[in-house]
């Protein structure tokens, strides 16, 4: 049951779905194998684009680097505010880099100067530097991977999310969701070099393999904005994506293809970068998270984590750029935990490392068999994952600590208002109600996620003990689709499960009205603070 009940709750309800705005829309069911590819005919500006961008994009594809003790896997741990450091040659966690206090620590103090909500990662193989983005403190830390020490720290734009290094490793470009800009960080000395307007709600920056172009997706604009790195100017806008909300994206090693994921609708837009054209939109499943390309001994593939189904999908790439789902449906890899999120291949493509957001672990997947071969405990609530070949001296664990380790989450059973089990996994829709509990600073963080409940309804969640007694935990309201992507409460939790009941109808109506007003969006499509809360978890 609950004692010392403290703290409020955070509800980040799903944004409105909006329209696709796509001519000749193409949707593929990744599980069933149905695909209706769009024609990939060259756009009128294709030839001009090649000249404008300085040549083909596939010239700098990396060569395979065998797994060794000099490699590292990093995870951004949002609740413990750490970066977990893994030695992939032994598949063990060496320790964590603490960039701030664990949640409910000193972070509420006005004198606190640490990071809050460690979330995004990128690695430069040239300078051996790791960039770490914290989305609530709006900061970027540059870490020397040989020593695990922060070499500089920069305050960037509001709700900074994910980014990439330039080819020489001297700059780090990060998308600022709340400022409609990309901030260019001096990765050598720290500080802001420039701020580039790119359109509403930029979410992530990825670079072309030759380093000449930056591709920016958005959470409130159905396009990928193309920026010329040398001039800091947008040079193209790839439109026609499957949804206006794209949290994550990845570019292929040959620079010919980009996948932009639409988490809230469970889809992926596949983009042909030769013609700057969306070629297909795949239906992939609830909470589709991060895509990643990998050239393996078995061929060229794209992998995608689907958090709502506890799966990682594998797609074989084709010359046309459209996944051949008709003859080779996506391979489903069942993860060994809950909510797969970040993903990255080893330097030789023989393995994948997948962060399990609601299990505080990392799965190791053998790409030859598409099977999980190991699971590694790490810090709390992993988001981004990066594999860094030749990042540190073999056996080195310099300056690492243990913050966030040995405090793994547990997922407890749930009961819906009608008495049915909420944690039962529907193979298409996911779970109706998930409840994750993890220890934080002497209390428990109770995280709920609801899907497909009654729309615009206020629910009361209870902790249910073994003796049947209940204690109130938190109340929350669903959006127009019956979803509540993230609800947080902090208390001492000693129950066995979580149960739901519909709250007073009058209160529900008022709360739902306020929720709908907050998510109605402004006339100019600007990102609101409420919108940004949604992707505290993506």
Regions found by a protein language model. Name each.
Residues 1-9:
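Bacterial Sec-dependent N-terminal signal peptides
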Residues 5-6, 14-431, 455, 472-481, ...:
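Predominantly soluble domains enriched in secretory-pathway, periplasmic, or organellar proteins
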Residues 433, 442-448:
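Structural beta-strand segments of beta-rich domains
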Residues 447-449, 482-491, 529:
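Exposed aromatic-hydrophobic patches
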Residues 457-463:
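Short beta-strand segments enriched for Tyr within beta-sheet-rich domains
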Residues 463-474:
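Short beta-strand and strand-turn-strand segments in soluble, beta-rich domains
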Residues 493-515:
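Short, surface-exposed ligand- or partner-binding patches at beta-edge/loop junctions that are enriched
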Residues 510-536:
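Short beta-strand elements
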């Amino acid at each position: 049951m609950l004692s010392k009940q403290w703290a409020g709750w955070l509800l980040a309800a799903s944004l409105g779905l909006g329209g696709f705005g796509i001519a000749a829309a193409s949707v593929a069911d990744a599980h069933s194998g149905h695909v209706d590819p769009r024609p990939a005919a060259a756009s009128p500006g294709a030839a001009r684009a090649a000249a404008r961008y300085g040549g083909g994009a596939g010239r700098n594809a990396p060569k395979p680097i065998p797994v060794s003790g000099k490699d590292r896997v990093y995870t951004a741990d949002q609740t413990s505010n750490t970066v977990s450091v893994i030695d992939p040659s032994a598949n063990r966690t060496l320790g964590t880099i603490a960039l701030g206090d664990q949640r409910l620590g000193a972070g509420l103090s006005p004198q606190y100067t640490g990071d809050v909500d460690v979330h995004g990662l990128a690695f430069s193989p040239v300078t051996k530097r790791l960039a770490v983005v914290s989305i609530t403190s709006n900061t970027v830390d540059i870490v020397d991977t040989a020593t695990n020490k922060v070499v500089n720290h920069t305050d960037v734009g509001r709700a900074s999310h994910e980014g990439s290094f330039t080819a020489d490793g001297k700059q780090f470009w990060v998308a600022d969701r709340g400022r409609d800009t990309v901030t260019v960080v001096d990765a050598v000395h720290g500080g802001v070099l420039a701020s580039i307007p790119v359109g509403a709600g930029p979410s992530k920056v990825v670079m072309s393999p030759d380093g000449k172009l930056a591709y920016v997706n958005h959470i409130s604009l159905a396009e990928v904005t193309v920026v010329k790195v040398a001039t800091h100017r947008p040079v193209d806008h790839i439109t026609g994506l499957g949804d206006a909300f794209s949290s994550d994206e990845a570019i292929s090693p040959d620079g010919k293809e980009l996948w932009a994921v639409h988490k809230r609708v469970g889809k992926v837009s596949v983009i042909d970068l030769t013609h700057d054209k969306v070629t297909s939109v795949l239906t992939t499943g609830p909470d589709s998270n991060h895509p990643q390309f990998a050239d393996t001994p078995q061929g060229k593939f794209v992998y995608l984590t689907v958090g709502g189904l506890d799966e990682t999908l594998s797609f074989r790439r084709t010359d046309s750029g459209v996944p051949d789902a008709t003859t080779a449906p996506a391979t489903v890899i069942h993860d060994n935990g809950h909510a797969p999120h970040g993903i990255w291949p080893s330097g030789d493509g023989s393995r994948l490392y997948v962060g399990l957001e609601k299990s505080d672990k990392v799965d190791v997947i053998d790409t030859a068999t598409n099977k999980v071969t190991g699971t590694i405990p790490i810090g709390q609530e992993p988001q981004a994952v990066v594999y860094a070949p030749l990042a540190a001296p073999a056996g080195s664990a310099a300056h690492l600590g243990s913050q966030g380790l040995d405090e793994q989450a547990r997922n407890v059973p749930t009961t819906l208002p009608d008495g049915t089990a909420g944690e039962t996994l529907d193979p298409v829709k996911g779970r109706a109600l998930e409840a994750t509990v993890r220890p934080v600073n002497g209390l428990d963080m109770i995280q709920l996620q609801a899907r497909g409940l009654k729309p615009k309804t206020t629910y009361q969640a209870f902790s249910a003990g073994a003796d049947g007694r209940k204690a109130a935990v938190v109340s929350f309201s669903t959006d127009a689709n019956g979803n509540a992507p993230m609800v947080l409460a902090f208390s001492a939790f000693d129950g066995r499960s979580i149960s739901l009941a519909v709250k007073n109808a009058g209160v529900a109506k008022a709360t739902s009205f306020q929720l709908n007003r907050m998510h109605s969006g402004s006339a100019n499509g600007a990102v609101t603070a409420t919108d940004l809360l949604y992707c505290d978890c993506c």
